[in-house]
């Protein structure tokens, strides 16, 4: 058995030279060396492949991130001074995750938490909750915005669905033909990209969808799935792109993400990513409610207000929940009893987390895993004010 204690989560950082940035490394205090010269698109704060550090302070120079890519992020690794989360769970799933979690999801980590900085991504959706399909699995997800951003959310009211499908289908056919020409050497990459840009203007897939502009502190809940969404980019108005904290059910993209428009992206060799346009239109929720962006912006619920801290529930779905705690005043405390695991992310400030007989220091941008067997944990504020996100 392992000690009853909190664990620093070793973040897995995904380098994304085309759509990442330096926000994540700066927040974590790691904007130096390799991380100062590479753009980071995502930090996996919790996943089934997470490793838990035995180090007791995120400010310890030996506490380092894992640098990886989106294809390898779930593969087993063995950083120094750590234990794999999966190994901890295997010792006693109920004691680590909680009885209700194991009953609902089985003896595995069901939650995927990502700290993201991203420019535009594809038009996409996930099959509706409860769908049984030989390939596709639902992927409930929710976004909590740290900075103002730009998205598409739902399809416009009164849209001609056949025209929308025809538009993205023909556009994809032309782009695939250009891809073959580049791959065969009969057309240059530059010429193909120039033609793609003209085709996007002609077919204009964005004319069919709603734009929305989340502010810092907004939460968008897409957990019912079947909802069109994408991140968009305007580097003049939103130079940081979309900076957000994502909660998802731990399902990988290759069995969950159905795309209809990939923004005309073409790799250096001329290849393009396959789209799933027929499935996109087969599984999209066409109801007015699902396609109204206002449906998905969630209002928080006030829980507690005390002199030393305040607590609000940002959201609660049948898969996961997210609370925000603001601790005010140096050495102010927060205490909680638990019947399931908790994940604590420090959005700002610095805290000391104690569970069992172990205390760890957690600075801004870092996170802690607290197993259910701790039964309770306490937080002492090490700064003037700290903002904490608690997921479970």
Language model features with spans:
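Short beta-strand segments in beta-sandwich/barrel cores
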Residues: 151, 332-333, 342, 349-354
